[in-house]
């Protein structure tokens, strides 16, 4: 019997940040006899029949760690094919002293630009670091393996062809400086017929301080009436929002591999992005120079249509959730 342990912060399709993780869980479960999910928060009804969920929720960080290890230990004794830690290096670090003596492979899935001591330490104890692209993790290590993003393409209908001019622009992502929303607002000032709708969570004090600054900038640029600053949305609402848009904008700085870019592409929408990581997905007409609003505005103005179906095909071929799950299992075999 093949058994896999998957550790994440939330296994809940309504979570605005981690809702897409449930599709990954289902794809993994389809390829093993039993999948054990350990998470702080779990929506049991969302898990497949061959999936067992254990919550390690607790009021304190120490309590969560203790409950996590208490749930993990008996699963390791049953010798799973691997433990996959999702996005949080601390899960791999805590698991290592228990997994290594039993020779249970340990994998970390990580796609953020920000690293830190926990990630550096986790790299030393895991067998493999899985990510979207070798550039989408702040590491240089032979342990890094690119396996695509794991997009649930079937959940994202292909919208009708969007022809220019693109008037209804959409941005999805945190209200954080790294997301480059100031660049997008300044580009909007050069597109007098366009509107912009933003939706995203505010996860930190810095995020909560940044949103009012963006609202003030919109007023300063005289685009306030054309911008909607929305809150975080449940993951299930994303296909609907994409269906309302003419195009998606993503100005995240650095080597970002933001999931929304792949989701928009899978929806056959033109998506304009600045990260170099998208050079294998987006044609030149959809890629702009980060921090240069005029570059983004010009790309939107000059878009002549036709990119949608090819974008979806590329996501399906290289970034589908089924392909992702298969590559995870191959990496820990």
What do the PLM-derived regions correspond to, one by one?
Residues 302-332:
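A charged, aromatic-enriched C-terminal amphipathic alpha-helix characteristic of glycosyltransferases
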Residues 5-7, 162-179, 185-191, 197-199:
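Conserved donor-binding/catalytic core segment of Leloir-type glycosyltransferases
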């Amino acid at each position: 019997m093949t058994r896999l342990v998957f550790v994440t912060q939330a296994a809940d399709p309504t979570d605005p940040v981690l809702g897409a993780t449930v599709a990954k869980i289902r794809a993994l479960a389809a390829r093993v006899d039993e999948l054990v999910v350990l998470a702080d928060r779990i929506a049991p009804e969302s898990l497949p029949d061959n999936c067992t969920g254990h919550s390690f929720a607790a009021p304190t960080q120490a309590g969560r760690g203790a409950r996590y290890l208490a749930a993990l230990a008996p699963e390791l004794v049953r010798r799973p094919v691997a433990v996959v830690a999702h996005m949080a290096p601390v899960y791999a670090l805590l698991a290592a002293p228990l997994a290594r003596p039993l020779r249970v492979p340990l994998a970390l899935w990580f796609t953020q630009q920000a690293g830190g001591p926990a990630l550096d330490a986790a790299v030393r104890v895991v067998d493999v670091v899985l990510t979207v692209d070798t550039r989408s993790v702040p590491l240089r290590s032979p342990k890094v393996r690119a396996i695509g993003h794991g997009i649930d393409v079937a959940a994202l209908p292909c919208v009708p062809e969007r022809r220019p001019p693109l008037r209804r622009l959409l941005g999805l992502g945190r209200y954080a400086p790294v997301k480059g929303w100031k660049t997008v607002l300044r580009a909007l000032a050069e597109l007098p017929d366009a509107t912009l709708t933003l939706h995203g969570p505010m996860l930190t004090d810095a995020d909560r301080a940044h949103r009012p600054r963006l609202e003030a900038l919109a007023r300063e640029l005289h685009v306030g009436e054309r911008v909607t600053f929305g809150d975080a949305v449940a993951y299930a609402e994303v296909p609907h929002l994409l269906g309302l848009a003419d195009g998606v904008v993503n100005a995240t700085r650095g080597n970002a591999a933001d999931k929304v870019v792949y989701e928009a592409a899978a929806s056959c929408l033109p998506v304009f992005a600045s990260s170099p990581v998208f050079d294998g997905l987006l044609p030149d007409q959809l890629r702009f120079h980060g921090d240069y609003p005029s570059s983004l505005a010009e790309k939107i103005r000059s878009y002549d249509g036709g990119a949608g179906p090819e974008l979806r095909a590329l996501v399906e071929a290289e970034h589908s959730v089924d392909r992702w799950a298969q590559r995870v299992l191959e990496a820990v075999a």
